[in-house]
């Protein structure tokens, strides 16, 4: 097991870095405003049609543009889901959604969470899937990348107050990054057997003689951006464990690569833009080390079997419950870590069926803020918040004003950093408490006791951190749960983006100080250790009590 697991992780990271490096070069050019070859005419035509003027924006204007796009998309998607029954491309004649489910779904896809309180094949029409959800998969991913573009420029520029043009960035990200790569991935998925059609559901007779319906649909086109944009919402209820979404071991591996591709490339781009590639590599090393340790722990936990079965005298050397045999223990474990380290939430196995410790690692990866590679854009700006916190702590220890990349980190930046870091823990802990204190919240719990608490904690953690995966075991399609999780998803997304943009606006106007003998090096092994320690410290102090009541207590109760 150890050799196979090591080979799988090593080959995954090697291919990831080989693909991410050239993409990082492209992203760096876009951040610096260097036109890509042969695309200037297309860009100018799109901007003329959309009425976009290529003028620089300050942080408030940039933030307002991002918020306007997402709020407008929220209302459009909400209306589309409510009116689904009268819209085209609905061969199964599926009705419109209830108001609370439509609200939850709209917020979910606009916020890049893709939490699903429904089964896609029995709830949504092809029109809703293609024009509603797939479009938001592109726009939410582009929004996250645009925010990190602005923050990266804030570190690279000095004595100005502009961060680029949000509409220009969104257009370029969508046209030259998300669309072309998604097209290539979608064609590969189709070649491997993923569905892509607009046919009505097919009727067939099973071996038992029962007539059933075989779902159809434009799956591959949504599956590609679902992975590349770290969205995660599946066309089918079984998500990427469904053979129509993820038919082979090769598509499974490509899906994992697609999830991490842009987050890793952004680290390379960050180093290029700030003219110090060591900075990008430092962030990548910190993310990779945490990722490797977590992946190894989940593989180890799942390989040692299910204690529930052992107590019943059932031979259970490995825990295959809830896993697809075509993927097995190692690929399922790695997928679980990838999808929760990033804010993706796609699943190829049932996380609720993992062992107590095997399920705790994905839960904890979400709770630390999705900063281990993380979502497209959101992962890097989340990690940079921890970088600012780390240099602040180091500055206190050595008695110097904290600096990062020559920019002094003052009281304003630290207040905003603290606010951004504390938004999601507050949502998780208070949301979990509210769900457990109210009858409406407890009525959705199917599994009472320790594991039921873990399921509630996982659901709220997933929503607040914009992941979207679930432990299941909850009846989440109710007014209480749909509204609670919608609130957590919206505030968890934009409650972090607002202070991040404010930090960018503050930093971009500052002068870049020359490096001196007293400057703390923010690259190399020492700073990697300091950064990882900061992430672990904040995560441990915040969530250890809650984890002790859930997965830890469940693990100890089985020994």
Swiss-Prot record:
Primary subcellular site in the record, as a coarse category: membrane
GO MF, one example: potassium ion binding
Keyword annotations from UniProtKB, A to Z: Cell inner membrane, Cell membrane, Ion transport, Membrane, Potassium, Potassium transport, Transmembrane, Transmembrane helix, Transport
Family statement: Belongs to the KdpA family.
Protein name: Potassium-transporting ATPase potassium-binding subunit
Quaternary structure and interacting proteins, as annotated: The system is composed of three essential subunits: KdpA, KdpB and KdpC.
Gene: kdpA
UniProt keyword annotation of Transport present: yes
Species assigned in the record: Enterobacter sp. (strain 638)
GO cellular component annotations of the record: plasma membrane
Role, per record: Part of the high-affinity ATP-driven potassium transport (or Kdp) system, which catalyzes the hydrolysis of ATP coupled with the electrogenic transport of potassium into the cytoplasm. This subunit binds the periplasmic potassium ions and delivers the ions to the membrane domain of KdpB through an intramembrane tunnel.
């Amino acid at each position: 097991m150890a050799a196979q697991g090591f080979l799988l992780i090593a080959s995954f990271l090697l291919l990831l870095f080989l693909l991410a490096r050239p993409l990082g070069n492209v992203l760096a050019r876009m951040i610096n405003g260097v036109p890509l070859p042969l695309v200037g005419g297309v860009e100018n035509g799109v901007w003329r049609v959309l009425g976009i003027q290529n003028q620089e924006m300050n942080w408030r204007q940039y933030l307002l543009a991002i918020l306007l796009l997402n709020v407008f998309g929220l209302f459009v998607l909400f209306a589309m889901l409510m009116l689904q029954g009268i819209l085209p491309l609905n061969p199964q004649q599926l009705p419109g959604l209830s108001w609370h489910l439509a609200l939850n779904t709209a917020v979910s896809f606009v916020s890049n969470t893709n939490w699903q309180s429904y089964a896609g094949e029995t709830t949504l029409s092809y029109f809703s899937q293609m024009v509603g959800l797939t479009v938001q998969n592109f726009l939410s991913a582009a929004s996250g990348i645009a925010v990190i573009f602005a923050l990266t420029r804030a570190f690279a520029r000095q004595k100005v107050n502009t961060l680029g043009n949000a509409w220009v960035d969104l257009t370029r990200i969508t046209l030259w990054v998300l669309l072309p790569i998604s097209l290539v991935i979608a064609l590969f998925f189709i070649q491997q057997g993923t569905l892509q059609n607009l046919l009505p559901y097919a009727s067939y007779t099973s071996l038992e003689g029962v007539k059933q319906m075989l779902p159809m649909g434009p799956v591959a086109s949504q599956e590609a951006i679902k992975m590349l944009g770290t969205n995660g919402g599946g066309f089918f209820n079984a998500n990427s464990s469904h053979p129509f979404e993820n038919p082979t071991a090769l598509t499974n591996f490509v899906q994992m690569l697609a999830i991490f591709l842009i987050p890793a490339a952004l680290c390379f781009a960050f180093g290029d833009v700030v003219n110090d590639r060591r900075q990008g590599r430092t962030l990548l090393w910190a993310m990779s080390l945490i990722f490797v340790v977590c992946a190894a722990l989940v593989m180890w936990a799942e390989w040692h079997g299910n204690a529930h079965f052992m107590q019943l005298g059932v031979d259970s050397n490995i825990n295959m419950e809830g896993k697809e045999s075509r993927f097995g223990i190692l690929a399922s474990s790695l997928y679980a870590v990838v999808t929760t380290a990033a804010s993706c939430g796609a699943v190829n196995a049932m996380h609720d069926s993992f062992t107590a410790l095997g399920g705790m690692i994905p839960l904890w990866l979400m709770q630390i803020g999705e900063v281990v590679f993380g979502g497209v854009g959101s992962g890097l700006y989340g990690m940079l918040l921890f970088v600012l916190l780390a240099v602040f702590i180091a500055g206190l220890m050595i008695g110097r004003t904290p600096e990062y990349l020559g920019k002094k980190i003052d009281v304003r930046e630290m207040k905003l950093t603290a606010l951004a870091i504390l938004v999601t823990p507050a949502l998780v802990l208070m949301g979990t408490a509210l769900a457990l204190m109210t009858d409406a919240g407890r009525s959705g719990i199917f599994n009472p006791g320790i594991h039921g608490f873990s399921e509630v904690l996982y659901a709220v953690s997933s929503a607040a951190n914009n992941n979207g995966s679930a432990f299941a075991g909850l009846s989440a399609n109710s007014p209480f749960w749909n509204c609670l999780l919608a609130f957590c998803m919206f505030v968890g997304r934009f409650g972090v983006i607002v202070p991040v943009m404010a930090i960018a606006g503050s930093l971009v106007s500052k002068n870049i100080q020359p490096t001196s003998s007293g400057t703390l090096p923010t690259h190399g092994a020492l700073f990697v250790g300091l950064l990882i320690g900061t992430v672990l410290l904040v995560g441990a102090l915040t969530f250890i009590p809650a984890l002790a009541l859930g997965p830890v207590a469940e693990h100890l109760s089985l020994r």
